[in-house]
């Protein structure tokens, strides 16, 4: 534990917390005065959502299920829009794509079994990271994601160096291991875990995508 805490203090990254726009329990936006607004920007009284025809407030299974579904969609959209991408996510996504290309066949479980077997030239991975970073910057400019503070101003090599420090700080198992001019993909499961942050945006392998 002491070693882990000591590593955390040495990291140049940190815990990122991002707050999305507030919503009420029906998915309407809420201003600083607590007033709810519907999708057309009109002020609404949330009490009206649970008031029956007789003017009584009460539960309605079908109605409430629909409200729950709509609220879930709003929360999921907000989560996507407020996703903060860090160097670990970018490097892991690029490395996992290199793993898939190197193995060349099979499914997720086949790829994950190739731990410590695939080595990628560092320059090749850096180029893949930069290509992915270009797409991420386009997404960020469109307001669909947010890039972490330690992503700005870095190229592919810089992001790899930052990610390697973060991996070694958070995990006892090595994720990417330098070997000469190469990086060995050691912990394929952690690479998959980190790259998942980009999967919902269509920028990494999505294990849940419909075939």
Task: Identify the residue ranges that each predicted region occupies.
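Membrane-interfacial terminal anchoring regions of lipid-handling membrane enzymes
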Residues: 1-211
């Amino acid at each position: 534990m002491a070693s882990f805490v000591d590593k955390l203090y040495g990291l140049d990254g940190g815990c990122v917390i991002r707050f999305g726009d507030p919503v009420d329990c029906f998915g309407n936006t809420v201003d600083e005065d607590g007033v709810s607004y519907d999708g057309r920007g009109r002020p609404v009284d949330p009490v009206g959502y649970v008031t029956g025809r007789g003017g009584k407030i009460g539960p309605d299974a079908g109605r409430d299920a629909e409200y729950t579904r709509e609220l879930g969609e709003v929360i999921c959209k907000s989560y996507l829009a407020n996703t903060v991408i860090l160097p670990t996510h970018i490097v892991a996504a690029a490395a996992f794509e290199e793993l898939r290309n190197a193995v060349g066949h099979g499914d997720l479980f086949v790829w994950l079994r190739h731990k410590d077997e695939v080595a990628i030239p560092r320059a090749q991975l850096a180029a893949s990271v930069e290509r992915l970073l270009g797409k991420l910057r386009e997404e960020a400019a469109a307001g669909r994601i947010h890039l972490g503070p330690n992503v700005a101003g870095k190229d592919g090599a810089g992001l790899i160096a930052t990610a390697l420090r973060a991996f070694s700080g958070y995990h006892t198992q090595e994720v990417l291991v330098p070997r000469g001019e190469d990086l060995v993909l050691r912990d394929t499961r952690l690479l998959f875990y980190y790259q998942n942050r980009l999967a919902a945006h269509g920028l990494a392998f999505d294990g849940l995508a419909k075939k």
